[in-house]
Amino acid sequence: MQIMIKSLLEDLNKYVKAMQENSENAKQFSDLFRENYMSLKEEQQLDDFYERLWSEFSSDPKIFTLILSIIYDVVRDDRSLYEIFYLLQHSDMDLLSQIYIRDQLETCIFRNSNLSRNYRNRRNLHKQLLTKLENLIDVNLDYKPYKFRNKKRIVLTICQLLGDSHAPTRVLKEICYILQNKFHYEVLVIVAIDDMYDGDLSSIWYHPAISFYNENYNGSFTVKYKEEKINGFQFIMNHRNLGIIKKLINIICNYNPAFIWHMGNRCLFADLFRKYTTVMAMPFTDGYTISEAQIMCTYLNSHSDEIKDMEAYLGETGQKPLQYDLRLPLTPSMKTYHRKDFNIDDKDFVITVVGNRLDIEVNNEFKQLLRKILKISSKISIAFVGIFESYPSFINEDEIFSTRTKFLGYQEDLIGVLGIMDLFLNPPRQGGGGGAVYSLYNGVPVVTLNYCDVANSLEPEDTCNSIQEMFGLIQKYFYDKVFYQKQSVKALEIRKKRGLDVFFNNTKTMLEEAVELFE
């Protein structure tokens, strides 16, 4: 067994060297490492392999992290991510490196790693990092009770503000609009971008995810949305801006809002305020975010086992859960699209797959499902919409992909384009909720697993427990025309739930319930 482990380490070394030299042999070494790794896994010998790695590399946690991230990139086995998690919690690595690595881990989780079910460990790591950051910044301010705050001011925090086609950005802007225009709040938006990436840190994670942001918003900014002006401030959360963080805390505390409302994923900056005022944290995905906020708000709740575990943990920490029945109003397309616009046959049964991370989400497991679907009938075709840079290589993998799929590219008017489809297929992933809602609005049924954002737009009986169930449901949609028509009519019911009056009333109810929890 030791010989196998030694051989596996040598394979990994060859692969890394080939990648550094941009050698054409890199894929060969990658395949060899993957094959030998999976053999060890099947023989239940991975513990010995990782113990060997710990004994050889744990003295240099950054190099060790890099090696583990390479392993994950090659084999996509969550075990390597668990090892990084443990390393982060027990090494003496500097704080900013820890934050950077944690953000890479969370990106892997969002991209559908099974590690996403380990909510408690993620929370413990977040609290550990938050405590270190608080000690580093060292702000001494007293907590201000709600009765002494300005009841007509709200500060919203977010980690990324892009264009209106970016679903989280649109959610934030819609909420800003209704808070200002209908509830007459004074709203200030703080965009705190977690971007610890620099030349040194790039050497501790293989193929790191990079945060995208609009540089035009740096510093103070004003954006117009509908007839409202939204004022805000954007800064980069990195080692060069720790002074800005401290200054912003003092400015915002003097601004004295009724509460801080964080939207999105984990945000150390927003959590810093929990010692001075009330913080409410709300993710854009299913369940609850990673936060030490006093109030944990959710508007997507699939009630899966994972979410139930989150809620149990909130009970243990004393954090207060809050349900927000967020139903953003939908604006129909001003244009009518036809299949001929995209060279799609009118007689085909077209299944669409929509996303801005299709390069990652169309993985081997999902490709197998697509092959099975396309073999049901020659009348079935698949249309990808979004960002899929690897589509040319995807269609070269199999003739059935090259002849029976199309890539429509990124579509600004997504709600209009989805009207020409027959079915919306959601890959195993956390996101996809926006595209699913647009499909339902057009009367296009949705096929999805039951533990993701998309599931929140469907009745439980219309979701699937497994990939195999998804395949069976697609077959039923294709063959059973009566069932398809019934589900199409059911999909259109979403229009009744997406008016401005519903948005207003549900937001009013949530704000009233939130105030009751403040003190």
PLM feature segments, named:
Residues Y255-F259, G419-G432, V444:
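Acidic donor-binding loop of glycosyltransferase active sites
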